From Swiss-Prot:
The lineage of its organism: Eukaryota, Metazoa, Chordata, Craniata, Vertebrata. GO terms for cellular component: nucleus. This is Hepatocyte nuclear factor 1-beta. Pfam families: HNF-1_N, HNF-1B_C. It is found in: Nucleus. Residues 49-58 have a biased composition (Basic and acidic residues).
């Protein structure tokens, strides 16, 4: 005969035999330790009621006596709930009944106690899921700890026999209760039709079990305290009904009343089939009965959830890229870039970057590269400025100290950042009038200004004039008509129309990208092109004479006011 013991068990048994314990002692010890078919309680130790014989499974007599709970019963090993557990009222109630039905229930409970606790727990859990029974109902009736009950049903955590007897008693009685509920005919239901019938059935059945007790049971039930009222079970959608409703939601998100009533019949039929009863007994669903109002609320909740998810998605999208924190982002989102073809490295391309840093410094760097006979001017103005919140109207974006920019063999880079950031908060009308008249003139044009101030063809055009820290003041200066060549007029018309729609700071890049400062392949029309190439300058009217008297030393002092 092959031994069923594992190697570890054989080793332990050999150690016991080698320790001097005889075979008879081991058998006697095993008889004392192993629970008997009477569930660990010896028959001679039981206090039997006089009306019951020893063949009536006396487990309830043992469990209902408080002084016998100290015995080690099956299923007690490893129980984490160490609190003393008084005899549940449901056990006392069942023990006090002398009817044939009560005897059958006790026999069923004893049979379940003799089986594997984990198998019984899985059976009870499946039954609760099939009928949508919440654990709260079991806790209210049996007095068990909900955490311990959940662990026992889901993980097979050991539970004391007395507690398992209370759980099994509830399970046996619930089975009979549901059978009676489906077979019971509601009195007076023939006078109620339509939705009102379903609503009354909904509120009638939770109390139906207490108003119509099982025959043979006493009216004053001791299963619950006299002053404690049983709560009505909350409605819970079953998996069968949810499957039907989600399919209907894909077809129609807002069904009509007729469609909802058809869904009610379909859901109740599915719930009955799930419970293993005929669809004609849908009234026995009790608190789980599906009504038209519940279907309407289910669709309304799904529509609200979908609208809420869409709103969250839109908010997440709108708060992402639409709030730039630097000028580069503002320019990239404000207008498309039209870059000029160039063979210079990317680091030398024209651009502007506005960084929010702690220092109020403005640096400008210019790199000029020559390719053949054409001199390309590449400038990069890096603005390191504090956040606009920290600025006031007395601050300017350029440092107050003057700087000299030495240029050899080329023109000056365009000065396109002379503006006050606080002028962006002015009225739209005022900005519209200013931005339509803003221009920047090349140095050769300034030379022409000094020579043609008294010509008859001159017209008054405002030029940016920076005076005493205010960089937004405009002053009219007589410009010569020859400044406005056809090429310049077309550019100024485009720039004026664009600046009328957007703030000036966002227009700077548009003016740069419109080839206004690019090298012109057409012959220049100014008189001093050999001295000053077509570089742009923003100057004060008091400095025009100084610029006109400059020599050809290729070093042009440009003071940042």
């Amino acid at each position: 005969m092959v031994s069923k013991l594992s190697p570890l068990q054989q080793e332990l048994l050999n150690a016991l035999l080698n320790s001097g314990v005889t075979k008879e002692d081991l058998i006697q010890a095993l008889d004392d330790m192993i629970p008997s078919p009477s569930f660990g309680v010896k028959l001679e130790n039981l206090h039997m009621s006089p009306e019951h014989e020893s063949d009536n499974k006396p487990v309830f007599h043992t469990l209902t006596n408080g002084h016998h709970h100290k015995g080690k019963l099956s299923g007690d090993e490893g129980s984490e709930d160490g609190d003393d557990f008084d005899t549940p009222p449901i056990l006392k109630e069942l023990q006090s009944l002398n009817t044939e039905e009560a005897a059958e229930q006790r026999a069923e409970v004893d049979r379940m106690l003799s089986e594997d606790p984990w198998r019984a727990a899985k059976m009870i859990k499946g039954y609760m899921q099939q009928h949508n029974i919440p654990q709260r109902e079991v806790v209210d009736i049996t007095g068990l700890n909900q955490s311990h009950l959940s662990q026992h049903l889901n993980k097979g955590t050991p539970m004391k026999t007395q507690k398992r007897a209370a759980l099994y008693t509830w399970y046996v009685r619930k089975q009979r209760e549901i059978v009676i509920q489906f077979n019971q005919t509601v009195q007076g239901s023939g006078n109620i039709t339509g939705k009102s019938s379903q609503d009354q059935l909904l509120f009638l059945f939770p109390e139906f079990n207490q108003q119509n007790p099982v025959p043979g049971q006493p009216d004053d039930s001791c299963s619950e305290p006299a002053n404690k009222k049983m709560r009505r079970n909350r409605f819970k959608w079953g998996p069968a009904s949810q499957h039907i409703l989600y399919q209907a939601y894909e077809r129609q998100k807002n069904p009509s009343k007729e469609e909802r009533e058809a869904l009610v019949e379909e859901c109740n039929r599915a719930e009955c089939i799930q419970r293993g009863v005929s669809p004609s007994k849908a009234h026995g669903l009790g608190s789980n009965l599906v009504t038209e109002v519940r279907v309407y609320n289910w669709f309304a909740n799904r529509r609200k959830e979908e609208a809420f998810r869409q709103k969250l998605a839109m908010d997440a999208y709108s708060t992402g890229p639409s709030h730039p924190h630097n000028l580069n982002s503002l320019l990239s989102h404000g207008s498309p870039h039209h870059t000029q073809p160039s063979t210079s490295p990317p680091s030398k391309l024209q651009g502007m970057r506005y960084n929010q840093q702690g220092n109020n410094e403005v640096t400008s760097s210019s790199t000029i590269s020559h390719h053949g006979n054409n001199a390309m001017v590449h400038s990069q103005s890096v603005l390191q400025q504090v956040s606009p919140v920290g600025l006031d109207h007395s601050h300017s974006m350029l440092s107050p100290d003057g700087k000299l920019i030495s240029v050899s063999g080329g023109g000056l880079p365009p000065v396109s950042t002379l503006t006050n950031i606080h002028n962006l908060s002015q009225s739209v009308h005022h900005n519209h009038q200013q931005s339509q008249n803003l221009i920047m003139a090349p140095i050769s044009g300034v030379m022409a200004i000094t020579q043609n101030l008294n010509t008859s063809q001159a017209q008054s055009v405002p030029v940016i004039n920076s005076v005493a820290g205010s960089l937004a003041a405009l002053q009219s200066v007589q410009f010569s008509q020859q400044l406005h060549s056809p090429h310049h007029q077309q550019i100024m018309q485009q720039s004026s129309g664009h600046m009328a729609q957007q703030p000036f700071m966002a227009t700077v890049t548009q003016l740069q990208n419109s080839h206004m400062y690019a090298h012109k392949h057409e012959p220049p029309q100014y008189s001093h092109t050999s001295r000053f190439p077509s570089a742009m300058v923003v100057t004060d009217t008091s400095s025009i004479s100084t610029l006109s008297n400059m020599s050809s030393s290729k070093q042009c002092p440009l003071q940042a006011w």
